[in-house]
Structure formats: C-alpha cells, structure tokens
Amino acid sequence: MATSYSANNGQNEEYTFDAFEDGSSKLVGEQQLTKLNQFAVDYAQQIWKIEEALDETLNEVWDINIDPVSIYNKPHEQLDLIELVKTDHKIFNKVILVFSSICNQTRILKETAESKFYSPLTVFGEITGESSEGDVQIEVGKLLPFMIDLSAFVNRCYSLIRNIISQFASIYQSQKNIHTQFFKNVHLQAVYYSMIDIFSVLINLDSIITQNTALDSSWGRYLRMVKSVKQEPNKYSVSGEEDKLWQLEKLLLSLKGQLLEGFIFQSCIQQEFDFPGVIDVKGNKVLKAEFQYNVKVLWSMFGTKIMDSSELNLRERFPGFMGLYAFYIALFKDITDKSFFKQVWEVTKRVPMVSINVNVFWFPADFIQQLMPGMIKIVGSTFNHMEIRRDYLRNVDKEFSGRVKSYYLQVSRWMVRMESSQTRGGTLWDVSLSKVGQIIQGVQLSYHISHLLKTMIGLHMHLTAPLKSSDVRKLFQCAEMLKSIENTFHRRSAMISAHISMMVQQLTDIINEKLNVVRSKYAGRSNYSEIELDVIVALSLCSDLLCGVATNERITVVRLCLNVIYQSNILKENDIEELRLHIKRLEFISDIGKIVKASCDCSILFWSRDLFPTYLQFLYQNPSQATSLQYTLTGLKDVVSVLDKAIHVDNAKQRLIDVYRNEMEEMIDKNIIQPLGKDVETDLRLHIHAFLNIEEKDPFKTGIKEFGKFLELKPLRFFDRTIDIKSRISHYLDQTFYNLNTVALFDWKTYSEMRNMAFYKYGLQLLEVHLPGSTLEQGLDVLEIMRNIHIFVSRYNYNLNNQIFIQRSSNSKTLNTINITHISNSIRTHGSGIMNTTINFAYRFLVQKFSIFSEFLFDDQIKSKLYKNIKYFRENKEQLNNMYPSELVTELERDIRQLGVSETGLTFLDHFRLLITHIGNAMGYIRLVRSGGLHYCSNAIKFVPDLKKIPKFQDLTSKDALSPETIQASTNLDSIIHNLSNNLSEGTEYFKMLVNVFATEFRNIANQHLKNFYIIVPALASNYIDHMINSKDKLFKKSKAIGAEALLFTDDGFAIGLAYILKLLDQNKDFDSLHWFDRIQLKCETDQKRMLAEANAKGIKEDQNHLAIKKIQNFQQEYELFKYSFSGSRIFFKD
C-alpha cells in the first residue's frame, strides 16, 4: 500500500514545469477579475432597469408566503459509488462498496416511503362531502394499484434486511477468511443505523395503517363486494370472468394479510435468515456477540441523548431502535439480559409516545406488549401503560406553559441573531463556525417545539383528555414559532447559501484535523500490519471524499471509513464523539432545506382544526397579537403537501384542499371578520354620538380593544388566496352604511361623518354612497294618486314655484315628495291616456268640494256677517282710503270662532281655508300632470331633429316597395310622432277647461250667496298667514309635540285655490277693490312706527323692543310671500 502511494506521487513527473515565473499568469488573472467585476456591474444595472420598467420595487426581504421561488442548495452526487470507493486495497474496496451500497439503498427506501407511501395511507378516508352508496368501494379501487406497489416495497425491505444479515453473517463468523480478518475489530454502526431506518419505516407503516380505521373498514366492504359479484356474476354482467374475480379476491386477501393487520414489521423479523450449507445466522455466536455489542452501544448513545437539549431527530428513530432490539431477540432468542431490558424500559417510560407522521403516533409500550410480551415480566406485574401515559400527560400539561414561554424567548433571541449581519469580531473562520452553530440551534429549537406541539395534541387525542383554552393558545403559539423559524431560514437563505461552501470546508477541515491525529501515528513507518494498513486506506479515502461536495453518498462512505478507523483505538472517546457531531453537522448543512421543512411542519393542525375557532376567539380578544395570525395560517397550509398525494379521490388538490381551505376561511370570517366589522361599526357610532353623553366604559374592567391592529395587517396569504381583512371590513362598512342610509336618507350626514372617522381612526377609505338627498326617480304612482285624490290633497302640500308636492307628516323621519319627473315616469308606464282620466277624477273631486264650499257661504250666520262687512266698507269707503280695514277682519275671525271650535282646535274659518287649500292642491296636481306629460313628450320626441319638417315614413317605404308589414310599421311610427308633436306644441289647457265647466254654474243667479265670497278673502288670508307663522316657528324650534298640520313650510295650494275660485266667481275686480295688500303694508309700517315712538317716549332701548318688531316684520314677510304666490296663481287663470 505504501509503495503504491509513492508510485502515485511520481507518476506525473513528465508534466512538471520549471520554477521560473515571469508574472504573466498574475496579469492574466487580474485582467479576468476586472472583466468579471465589470460584468457584475453591468448585470446589476440591467436588473435595475428592468425593475424600473416594471414600475415595481422588488421586496428586499424574502417572504415565504409570496415568493414564487426559493433557493435549493442540496448537493447531488455525479459519480457512482464504484468511482467514489476507489483505492488500491481491493478487499477494502469490495467490502466498503457492498455496505455503502446497502446504506444507500436503505436511504432511498426511506425517502420513498416518506414521499410516496406515508401520505396516501394517512389521508385515506378524508372525504370532500357527504358520501353516497358505492363511494367507499370506488375509493378502494383507486387505492388498489397503490397497495400492490406498497406490497412490492415491503418485500424489497424484507430482502434488504436479509441481505444485510447475510453480509454480516459472512464477515462475522468463527471460520477465518480474508473478510473476517478484515472486520475482526470493526463495528459497522453505520449499517446498523441503516437497519434502524428500515425498521422505522416498517413500524411506521404498521402504525399508519392500523390507526386509520377507515382503511380496514373500506377494504372489508370492497372484499365483500367482490365476493358478492363472484357468487352472482350474471347479475353484474361479468359472467365468464370468474377466474379473474377469484384472482382478485386472492389478491385482496393476500394484501390484507400482509399489510392491513399490523404484521409488516413482525413478518420482517420472523422471516427465515438461515441458508443451510451457505449461511448460518442463528447459530453464529460471533455474529450474535457483534450484534449484541452494537445494540447495546447504540442504545446507550440513544438513551443518553434522548430528551436532551442537543437531541435532534432521535425520537423519529425510536421505533427503529426498538425494532432493532426486537429483531435481535427474535433472531437469536436471547432474553437473558434483563438489566439491558430495564434500560430500554426506562427510556420507554421517559418517552411513552412518539409522533412518526403528522397525526400518527407510536407507543413503545404497546410495541413491547405485542412483540415481546414475555419481557414485561421483568419490570413487574403492575404494568399499566395507560397510567404511564396519563402521568406523562399530567407532567406535560404542568410544564407546557413554562416551556412555551421559554421557547418563545429562545426563538426571539435566535431570530435576532440570525437577522443580524454584525459579528462579534474574530476571524472569518470563527464567524463561519458561529453561523453553523446558529443554523443548528434553529433546527434544534424547531425540533423540540414541534415535538412539544405533537405530544400535546397526540396525548390529548389518544387519552380523550380536554384541553384548556389557554393551552389552545399556547399550542398555536408553538405553530407560530415554528413558522417564524422557517420564515427566518427562508429570509436568510441567500446568506446561508453564500456561506454553505465555507461552512462545509471548515467542517471538513476540522474532521481532517481530527483524522490527522491518527495519520500522524503511522507517519515515518515502513512496515504496517493488516489492521494498520486498513486504517491508512480508510484515512486516505476519507480525505479524498471530504475534498468534494458533501453528498449523502460521500457521507455514507465516510461513516463506514470512520468505523474502520475507530478500530485503531488512537482516538479518544471525546474525539470520536466530536467526529460524529461534525459529520452530523456536515449532513445537516448539506441538506438544510429539507431538515428545516420537516422540523417546522405543522400538518398535524389539519387534524386539530376544531381548535382553530378557540384560537381565533382568543386572538380577537387580544388584538395586540394579531400579527401572529399569518404565521398560523402558514402552518395550517402545511398539510397541502399531504393532501395533494391523496389517491382515493380524483383531483385531490381541487377537492380535499378546497374543502379544507373554505372551512378555514369560514372560521376566520365567523370569528374575526364578522365581529370585527360589527365592533368597528359600533365604535364609530359611539364616537359620532359622543355628544349624547353615553355612559363611558371603564377600561380597567372591560379593557380596551385595539381593533386597528387587525386592520394594520398586511393581506393574509392563505393557500392560493389572499385574505385582506382591511378590504373586507371596508366592504362590510360600505354595504352597511349604504343599506342603512337607503332606509333612512335623513341620516346621510351621520354616515358621512362615520366614513371620515373610519379614515382618520382606522385608515379605512370607504366609498361615497352617492345617494340622492331626498329625491328618487320613482315616487307615488299617478294611478294611485288619481284613485285617492281626496287623501292626497289633504296629506300633501303644494309648492307653486318648484312645482312639487311635499308630504305633510310621516311615521318615519323622511318625507315623500312628488315632482315632474315622478309624474313623467308614471305617464311613461301607463301611457298618456292616463292624463285625461286624471282630469276626470279631479273634476269629480272638485264637484264634491264646491258643494261644501257653497254650503258654508249659504249659512245664514256667515252670510249675515259678510253682508254687514260689505255694507260697512261701501259706506265708509272714502274715509278708509279705499282700503279694507283690518279691524273688520279681526272682528269676523272672532265672530266665526264664537260659532264653535272642533276637537282639533280648528274654527270654521280654519276648515274653510283647508277646503280652499284642498281645491288648490287639486288644481296644482292637474298642473303637475300637464307638466309631467310635456316632460314625457319632450323626452320621447327629443331625437326628432326638426318638429316642423317631419318626413312621412309611410311615403318613403311605399316608394321603395317594401313589405306590407314594414309599411304598416312606418304608418304607426308616423302616427306616434304626430301625436307626440301635437301634444308637445299645443298641449291641453286643463285650467281653462275647468274654469269653463264650473263658471257658468257658479255665476248662475241661483248661487247669489256666492257673490259675497271676495269679502271673506282678507279673513282667510290672515288666517292663512297666522297658520304659516305658527307652523314655521314650531318647525324652527324642532318641537316634538307639534301636530301633523303644523309640520310644513310651504302651502301654496291655498293661493292657487283662492285664485281659481275668484276666477270662477268673476270676483277678481271686487277683491282688488279692497286693496287688502296695501292695507297690510300700511298697517305694518304704522305699527312699527308706533312701537318705536312709544319706546322712545318710555326710554326703552331698541334691543329690548326687538322681539315685537321682529314679529311684525315676520308677519309682513309672510304676507309678501303670500302676495307673490297669489299673484302668480292668478296668472294661470287670465283670459
């Protein structure tokens, strides 16, 4: 071996150059470095220009929820094992190659089980809704090819274990040969770890299958269906296929016996390993001693590290360690070492449960009871595994809160250090080692937190023990910490990737430095023993492998080489432990992405989603912790990688995942968004109505909820959707404010202020509703008004100038209005013929009202008082300057009041004024109908360019000899346009028509009592003015006790009714002769002067007499308004 090395060192002498160096290589290197630097600068500028072109700033911080890509830094081996294991020692090459190949196959089988078999078996039975008859059988039918693959996979595991045992039996035996001599003092612990991994896989499969009760139940139903079809093939149209059905049934029974009954691992360890005449296993004492030695050593290392703070991924191997021990007992039937079993039992009590795959848990006590029942007698007859688990659960519950708090502080410190780019000084070597330590610390933290989370959930589920609400919050806090760690690794992935090569180099240097201690012991020697020669070859191979990338294949071979090196006994136990530690670190650094993802996985939350509403309720009561919601949602979607592998349903991604996502979104909406929207709305209302002196809440008793914390959250990423709480609350408030504002239009200002407050307090930009202030396109229908015109005129007031009717009073806080647009829309609905019908109804109404009008004036008491006033005015006309005296008006009002007052406090004069107002409202409605008709006609004909030159479409169609139907349609069009044109240009003089129809009768000699009407007009006008002043005063004071009649600010129906009646009676000249408005003007001026003179005489200041003067001015102003309305109304009835 040594000679071969010297030969290798001198075999390339012909390629050796002389030592002369002219500096040209340095110049070339600097030139290339300059070009590379310029390329990097140019590339950065191009990227910056692309970013500016996209008009979008790229996020400087990586986010695991939104980043479309991530850095994948796992190395892959390009060389075969044969090329890696290449030395001049042929026996060494052969043995190392065989066992490294076995270890590599074990690793591949383990990865295959984790990626292909675990998830489909775990999620089988998860349904997307209500299942119907036959769905279970269909699901099993889809699973059948998968189960056949699983059977082949299990058989491959069996054969691999047989191969390992056969290899062991060949090298560990009493008969001496070159192999036994080589492995005399070598303990291949790396191979035993591979066996542990295989046993873990088989035990995990047993646990997953047996704990999924839906799988066994569905398989039984499918088997019964096959038997039924086989017994009645004609019924199911499968006659002639009996052989296939028999084969299918046999296959189902075979798969059930092999896979579904929990004997996968047991069948493995009970298979035959002896090959008579070739390999002896059970009688091989050397193999038994070697096996026993390795089992004890491995268990010793496992027992000391399990539950330790530096533990990492040991619990996942616990089933494999137990499987290795059970395999040893089954293989060699050795149950004599009771002390060792007690050590195993102590570990079992310390770790009574292990999470092996998401929601599947493994219990070592059950494993021992099933496969080693005779060993339980060693620990006594009082064995009660359920009580052990309850005690363990009590301890976990007791320590849970404190451990979560401790982990929270540790994670916070670790995240700060990982995010920090500063170092504590020292060399680059020290900094890199520090980064390695930080990475491993993060993985260890996530591992322990994940174990705590799964242990709490698993024990409570298995023992059906209730969880405290506070513990539920702590459970989700564990998930938040796991996602925080994973997110930190993701954010720092660029830094980690940049340092991985240096980290690997440093770790390999440390390993080589340790191995140099062994190498130095053999330096300078010319003769070596066989064992020493094997150690030197192993050292050389280790050095060669560590010079390359740290792939799984290289690390496997290095571990086998280290097992060979350890036999030299040169390294101390501490050095060996450090070597193992650095090899483990090297493995972690090389595959950090997969390890972090596995240790931070929160898929178990899918099977604990019933706890999610409790967590959301706690979060809503503590808004300061709202930022943790995104981490929890990230944890909840970890199960996607599991559900996506479901085989029993078609398109699992669109069915299982969508059902789960919708369920979670519904919980968030129910427990966060809906109550948040209502509480924000309530808070805004309390702020806006603070002037009402609402009783304030005591913050020390009720607490203060900072709802803004939820609204400050960035949009939450959940699966492929985004939950924007701020946007949803804005939409809720927009919708609520709009709907409520629509019902109560008078509250528009309140809701406008609430929108402003929502912006200033919560940053919510709400939409303006753009509701009309008080006018809608649709009001009371003209047909309904026509049928109930007697009610309409009494409940609505008319405004002459705006040509609008306003409701007197309403049960709500809004008043309905009717304008030209409403009437126009009604006419468009019913047709223009409704206008004439409306006039007919108005005529009948006027006939009834004029009958009452005539009766009032025919009354002897009224008639005598009017005659008296007319006589007095005629006799004293000159003394009164032709102006009707106001004293007579006051006297007439007093006399009529003496005739009686109604229950509502109205006199006969008030009733008479109301009668005239109703008549005027009817006339105003007729005017409104006419205006609405013209509005309708103008809108209908507005697309005709010239009404004076309208072509005849009938002539045009006839000229071109179009079809009769077209000619008929053009005739109809001509008729419609002609009618609309006439209606628009001519219109109908309804007022003139109604004057003519009543004038003759009113001026008849039989109605002589009506000729004195004009003399009561001043009294009616004064009564109207008093009524308007009183109503406006009460409206201004916002009195809540006023009656419906007083709630008005306009009532021009009285003016138009008065003008109409004066025209009917032809008494306009008679009324003008009274010069009543001049009298009122003179009276007001005289009263003001008199009051000022009296005030001056008495020395009263002007401001003390202000109210009296103001009253006179209001009276004068109201009379002027009435005068203008009355004068405008008289214009309608001029000839």
Curated annotation (Swiss-Prot):
A single BP term in Gene Ontology = protein localization to lysosome
Residues the record lists as N-acetylalanine modifications: A2
Identify the Pfam families for this entry.
WASH-4_N, WASH-7_C, WASH-7_mid
Q: Which residues form the signal peptide?
A: none
Keywords recorded for this protein, A-Z: Acetylation
Q: Which domain of life is it from?
A: Eukaryota
This protein's GO cellular component annotations are: endosome; phagolysosome membrane; WASH complex
Task: Name the InterPro entries for this protein.
Answer: WASH-4_N, WASH-7_C, WASH-7_central, WASH7
Regarding protein family, the annotation reads: Belongs to the SWIP family.
Q: How does it assemble?
A: Probable component of the WASH complex.
Per its record, how is this protein called by name?
A: WASH complex subunit 4
Q: Which species does the entry assign this protein to?
A: Dictyostelium discoideum
